[in-house]
């Protein structure tokens, strides 16, 4: 087995096959109110807060920011509570890491209550020391301090790996000195070549990850 003492996992697009909800949530919100959306992937393009502000202005919504936020949260809560699926091979890989004494934690942009619900429903919450929402702590994955915060939260030492699907987070983790496993996800297809250049190993699936770590 390759040396690994602790692992920091992203959730959406890495542990869960769930990125499409961020491509459709804004459109679903509008359609539920009888509005035909001009585009569906606002949050991917603009981020969550900017996307909400854009929706209010562009579609002349007679709603406050918080009202739109609450409506979107209902959509997301339903999705993570009932639908968001685990990626193939994840549970088997996590069990192998646990069997070898590897500490694990989740660092996600999703709200912690939603993340924990989805991980619990998929039977993998118990593998992790904690689930940390970067949005809730106010440090995002474009800042190397985010990964140090998460590492310190589980009192980890030794060789650490970050498991990520998004290029910007991969670049940040590398700049912070971490080894990085790039997990393939459709949502980052345009960045695939650049991702491969920046990771220690690029995996199309978790069977390949297991082989990389000689598990």
Task: Give the role of each language-model region.
Residues 2-91, 98-100:
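N-terminal helical cap/lid subdomain that shapes the substrate entry/recognition surface
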Residues 15, 104-107, 139, 162-163:
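Conserved SAM-binding loop
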């Amino acid at each position: 087995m390759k040396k690994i003492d602790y692992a920091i996992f992203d959730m959406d697009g890495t542990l869960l096959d769930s990125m499409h909800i961020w491509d459709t949530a804004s459109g679903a919100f509008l359609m539920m109110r009888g509005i035909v959306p001009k585009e569906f992937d606002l949050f991917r393009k603009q981020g969550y807060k900017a996307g909400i502000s854009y929706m209010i202005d562009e579609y002349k919504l007679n709603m406050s920011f918080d009202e739109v936020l609450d409506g979107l949260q209902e959509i997301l809560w339903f999705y993570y509570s009932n639908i968001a699926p685990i990626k193939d091979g994840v549970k088997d890989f996590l069990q192998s890491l646990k069997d070898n004494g590897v500490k694990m934690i989740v660092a996600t942009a999703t709200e912690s209550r939603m993340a924990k619900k989805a991980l619990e429903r998929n039977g993998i919450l118990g593998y992790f020391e904690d689930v940390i929402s970067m949005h809730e702590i106010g440090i995002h994955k474009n800042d190397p301090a985010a990964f140090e915060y998460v590492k310190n939260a589980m009192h980890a030492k030794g060789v650490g790996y970050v498991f990520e699907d998004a290029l910007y987070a991969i670049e940040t983790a590398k700049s912070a000195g971490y080894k990085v496993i790039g997990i393939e996800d459709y949502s980052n297809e345009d960045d695939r070549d650049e991702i491969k250049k920046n990771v220690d190993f690029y995996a199309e699936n978790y069977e390949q990850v297991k082989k990389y770590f000689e598990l």
